[in-house]
Amino acid sequence: MPVPTGARPSTRTRVWILVLALLLLGGGATAYTLRAASGRDAATGAADPGFTLDAGAGALYVRDTASGRVARVNPSASGGRVVGGPSCDRFHAAGGTALCLQRRPGVPARSYALVLDRSLREVRRIGLPGIPSRARVSASGNMLSWTMFATGDSYARSSFSTRTSILDLRTGYLVKNMEQIPLTLGGRRHHAPDVNYWGVSFAADDNRFYATVSTAGRTHLVEGDMRSWSARALRENVECPSLSPDGTRIAFKKRVSDGPREPWRLYVYELGTGREHAVAERRGIDDQALWTDRETLAYGYGGEVWSVPADGTGAPRRLAGGASSPAVPHPG
């Protein structure tokens, strides 16, 4: 007999409908969860499996501009680039440790310092104020430092503020802002509200370090001591110091012009003699140079990574196009 119009399904039918609905909803939820997790992984920009810091002596790592991820390049081979590292705005690595500074979009935008192991897996994450500017890891991989712009985005502007931090991985102790370090300037203790530090470079003992301090409109090279937590100014007109592997020389940015167009040149300062010389790179360099070995510097310019002999001879050589933040985790 035909079922009358408007008749309700049987109890068994209703049970099967409910089971089917739950299965469909469960499958959809599972798919949504998987897609969301995949989206989070893509957003964090984790390293691909097998992409590590163990590529051998002299291997060059950079931030690939097109992808925003860390890449390994072979300057001697045309097109020799492997992109597989995390997404970073600034990157540095040494001694089996990497430091990745990230700027995440949002309202408000957020910045992070990611501490990575030799497999480029995240081991610590620190929220940061401002815009990533400089990143450095000591040769041992134990000491890390980063600088953030709190306001402004260029040293060429008349006013800016920085926040420079130091992290000791051996103890986990974090100096959130080194502006409170006791500073000796001109033989006297210096106190001023306009003190800003940036561009830390560590010595081999993981205690001594060099950095730039700005105060009263002038920049100074300072030598710092972690154990005594003190710093003293050595000389003026030094920015973004980078200590050589043998600890005898410092590559730095020297201001050679007050104009906004290419105000800096790359110089090398001998700590023992106090002598300095310009390198063969004559363009204006706004970067913290990297010693790839005892005699060579690498740096970013014009969206590319270049190198030049540190002794003032030779000529600049392009290492990688569409790249920045050079790092050599295992110098040759």
List where the protein language model places each region.
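Beta-strand-rich domains and repeat architectures in extracellular enzymes and scaffolds
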Residues: 36-75, 80-100
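Blade-terminus and WD-like Trp-Asp/Gly-His loop motifs, strongest in beta-propeller folds
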Residues: 49-57, 90-97, 135-144, 194, ...
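Beta-strand C-termini and the immediately following turn/loop, strongest in propeller blades
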Residues: 60-66, 97-107, 146-153, 198-216, ...
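Structural motif
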Residues: 66-72, 107-114, 153-163, 217-222, ...
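Short loop/turn segments that connect beta-strands within beta-propeller blades
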Residues: 74-78, 117-121, 169-171, 224-229, ...
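Short coil/turn segments at the loop-to-beta-strand junctions that recur within blades
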Residues: 83-91, 127-134, 180-185, 235-241, ...
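Surface-exposed loop and turn segments in beta-propeller and other repeat-based domains
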Residues: 172-193, 321-332
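Blade-level signature of beta-propeller repeat domains, shared across WD40, Kelch, NHL, RCC1
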Residues: 301-308, 312-332
